[in-house]
Amino acid sequence: MSLDDPVVITCSISGVIANREQCPAIPYTPEEYGAEARRAVEEGASMIHIHARKPDGTPSYEIEDFSAITEAIRGAVDDVIVNYSTGTIGVPVAKRVEYLRACRPEVAALNMGSMNYAKYSRSRKDFVFQMVFSNPFEEIVELLKAMNELGIKPEHECFDVGHVGSLEPLMDMGVLKAPLHVDCVMGVVGGIPPTPRNLAAMVDNILDIPTEGANPGGVGGGRGHHWGVIGISRDQWTLIAAALTLGGSIRAGVEDNLYLPDGTMARSNGDLIAQARRMTEDVGRRPATVAEARGLLGIA
């Protein structure tokens, strides 16, 4: 990747932790997902990252909910890359593979390691929530094999430098092929602190991964793997600025952060994607079209 490449802007459309009491823009029903996807795509998003919910807002891992949401999104926009979450606590791998097999998204997230996962409140001097996010290698490999069988591109979500280091052994095993699509997730307590220097360190490690055969025919062909940043909470905007100047892609949406840089709560995912697009253009880059995004990700 380079500064000459267009920017893949992903919209994290819903998440499963926040709710409408915190932000009215969070979609619950398939129709609301479709409307939010349309707003995001109109502002420059080329990929939509989905956590499924039931119409009452409850997180769901059921085929019918993923299917209904995906159908609503595809009915609302001409074209967009659909990306499913597979990150859960307490949901068996087989259950996650079921909805991947039934719905066949182009991309699916794959968390690259286990960690403490928490949110800390300085005012309370305590954790708002804390959990162990378990992603052992045996589960990573099982999900990778399923994605390979189904023709789904894995999005490797790395919460620390050590997670990046877990990629090369999987390539050596033959279950992971170049070009890689890697996102640096920053801002979760228990993961790497959300600073531009730490992002640069993660990117250096990504770029050290062998790229033989990576992306020979796509946009940016021959320049290696695709990477981006996922900034959690209000550090998101600083990290987006850093990623754009380092040549990476970006993600925004109500899953990650509810607020614009001035502290105003977003009225929709479209507000957040519009801000991300303006920042992209302000550094002399441009949003990727959906076709260009597929090329950069190696799924064209």
Which residues does each PLM region occupy?
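Catalytic alpha/beta core domains of metabolic enzymes, predominantly
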Residues: 107-254
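C-terminal helical cap(s) of enzyme catalytic domains, especially alpha/beta-barrels
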Residues: 120-122, 261-281
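N-terminal small/glycine-rich loop or linker at the start of catalytic domains
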Residues: 1-25, 114-127
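Alpha-helix-loop-beta-strand connector modules within alpha/beta enzyme cores
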Residues: 59-84, 143, 202-210, 222, ...
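Conserved, mostly hydrophobic/aromatic
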Residues: 33, 40, 51, 108, ...
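Active-site mouth loops of central-metabolism enzymes
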Residues: 15-32, 86-93, 129-134, 191, ...
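Glycine-rich, proline-tolerant flexible connector loops at the mouths of alpha/beta enzymes
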Residues: 21, 47-66, 185-186, 190, ...
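Active-site beta->alpha loop and helix N-cap motifs at the rims of alpha/beta catalytic domains
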Residues: 60-134
